[in-house]
């Protein structure tokens, strides 16, 4: 997965108002998963940063992003879905990826307590010149935190100041990517990495603890 160095905030700003009058403003649902907000350290480490947030959420890891680069096989061209699955399993989590995932399947995963990492397109330089459906050079990993009837909400590692959102129809247009594998180019569609652990965070930020 290729990662641009220009960081683009999904949905214009972290949970800011929609621009057009009459459009319902996105509001983070009360049942949103309290996934920790992690900022990726470079343009190609969004996969490792997304996994880091998930590991923190399941309370199985206390290290940093750089400690996951080897486990996930992250290189200058990014992280593969297989690498994210491998990294999650290395820390005792159940993980797998799947293509052609539906919105209903995402909702079922969230309702069942799973964390989900999506592989989408982001950061368009000139979005008016090429529709999302034709873009594959701007792959980016985000962690799904909630869904409602109009929006998907994410922990986006390119942001770092709050959660982000995308309208569901737009998500369906952006939800694809490609990977250069040894066997050739793999064009994936609606790919998601599903991760489950035993001890999820109850809230974020967590309760106060004394400084050691």
Q: Across the structure, where does each feature detected by a protein language model lie?
A:
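Active-site-adjacent structural segments surrounding the nucleophilic cysteine of cysteine proteases
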Residues: 4-5, 11, 15-80, 122-123, ...
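Structured segments of extracytoplasmic/periplasmic soluble domains
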Residues: 53-61, 71, 87-94, 109-113, ...
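Mid-chain, structured segments of secreted extracytoplasmic proteins
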Residues: 74-104
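Extracytoplasmic/secreted envelope proteins and their assembly/folding machinery
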Residues: 47-55, 65-69, 81-85, 103, ...
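Active-site-adjacent substructure of cysteine-protease-like catalytic cores
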Residues: 99-158, 164
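Noncatalytic regulatory segments and standalone regulatory/sensor domains
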Residues: 19-22, 129, 135-136, 145-212
């Amino acid at each position: 997965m290729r990662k641009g160095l220009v960081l683009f905030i999904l949905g214009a700003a972290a949970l800011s108002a929609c621009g057009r009058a009459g459009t319902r403003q996105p509001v983070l649902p009360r049942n949103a998963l309290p996934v920790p907000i992690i900022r990726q350290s470079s343009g190609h480490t969004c996969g490792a940063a997304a996994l880091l947030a998930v590991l923190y959420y399941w309370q199985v890891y206390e290290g940093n992003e750089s400690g996951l680069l080897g486990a996930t096989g992250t290189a200058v061209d990014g992280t593969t879905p297989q690498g994210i699955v491998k990294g999650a399993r290395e820390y005792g989590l159940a993980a797998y990826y799947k293509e052609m995932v539906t919105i209903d399947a995402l909702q079922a995963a969230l309702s069942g307590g799973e964390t989900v990492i999506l592989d989408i397109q982001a950061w368009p330089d000139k979005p008016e010149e090429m529709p999302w459906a034709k873009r594959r050079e701007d792959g980016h990993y985000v962690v799904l935190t909630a869904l409602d009837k109009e929006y998907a909400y994410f922990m986006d590692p390119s942001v770092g100041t709050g959660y982000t959102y995308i309208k569901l129809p737009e998500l369906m247009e952006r939800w694809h990517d490609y990977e250069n594998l040894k066997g050739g180019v793999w064009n994936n569609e609606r790919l998601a990495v599903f991760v489950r652990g035993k001890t999820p965070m109850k809230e974020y930020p967590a309760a106060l603890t004394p400084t050691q």
